[in-house]
A protein has these predicted regions:
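Conserved, structured C-terminal
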Residues: 2-266
Length: 266
């Protein structure tokens, strides 16, 4: 297993809780380095430092394979959290500097730029991607978070959580995730984070889970949950607002993400 800093222990506990005795488990997080390469030129950049095939046919979205970069064996996954084509590159920690420098050197020909956590957070919100610990957690289920497309009952497999999901499958969710944009489009005004109250007229109907300013679309974006009885469809064009530092800011619900690029088939 390779785990992120925030959820490594959570993921490890969950996996070990459910695997059988016949399965061997090992946490190799500290043995490997993950480098993320995202953007329209990421495929071309990798093709210039490796002889492997990075086309859509060579590595499809959500697939992975071993490749060779500058003489180093690298596990490449075609995944992206920023709404653009991208790759995650995993290699032994003692080889990671060599791969990093090879990418930086070739990146000078492709407009490569370092990317911080907040930049990634903005772009994932533009694309409607949810963040574990904020937008989704053990307190939410797929039906509440708009993730029912990720559930399938077609196969006769008793997956973890199947029984619990079947019980709520046909029930109205107790809350629903909403994507919102503020009518005030000034950067950082207000400073949106999370846990801000969501109002319908003068009544609190939910709370925000994520917030940021999109420089690409010049809009303040917020995600949040609204309580049952307030369906997303019924709240469109209603008098909604988010309260920040005792001031209410009008918001509009959007049904689709701001960035709707198809990154799967390119």
């Amino acid at each position: 297993m390779i785990g992120p800093a925030a959820t490594r222990e959570h993921d490890k506990f969950h996996i070990k809780k459910h695997i059988s005795e016949e399965v061997n488990f090992k946490d190799v997080t500290e043995d490997l380095t993950c480098l993320g390469l995202y953007g329209p030129n990421s495929r071309k950049l990798l093709s210039n430092i490796s002889n492997d095939d990075f086309t859509n046919e060579g590595i499809k979205f959500s697939h992975g394979k071993f490749v060779n970069i500058d003489g180093v064996k690298v596990w490449a996954q075609r995944l992206s959290y920023v709404g653009e084509i991208g790759f995650e590159l995993y290699t032994n920690i003692d080889e990671s500097k060599k791969i990093f420098l090879a990418i930086i050197k070739e990146g000078k020909n492709h407009g490569l730029s370092p990317c911080g956590a907040h930049a990634m957070d903005i772009m994932r919100m533009e694309s409607g991607f949810l963040h574990w610990g904020h937008d989704i957690s053990p307190e939410e289920n797929q039906y509440q978070a708009g993730l029912k497309f990720a559930i399938s009952y077609k196969k006769n497999i008793n997956f973890v959580g199947k029984e619990a999901l079947l019980k709520i499958k046909d029930q109205n969710p107790t809350k629903s995730l909403a994507m919102m944009v503020l009518k005030d489009n000034r950067p950082g005004e207000p400073l949106l984070l999370h846990e801000e109250p969501i109002y319908l007229d003068d009544k609190i109907i939910g709370r925000t889970t994520s917030g940021n300013y999109s420089f690409n679309f010049k809009k303040n974006i917020s995600f949040g949950y609204v309580n049952s009885g307030n369906t997303i469809e019924n709240l469109i064009n209603k008098n909604l607002s988010i309260e920040v530092e005792k001031k209410k800011y009008p918001v509009t619900i959007i049904k689709k993400p701001l960035n709707q690029k198809n990154i799967k088939d390119i």
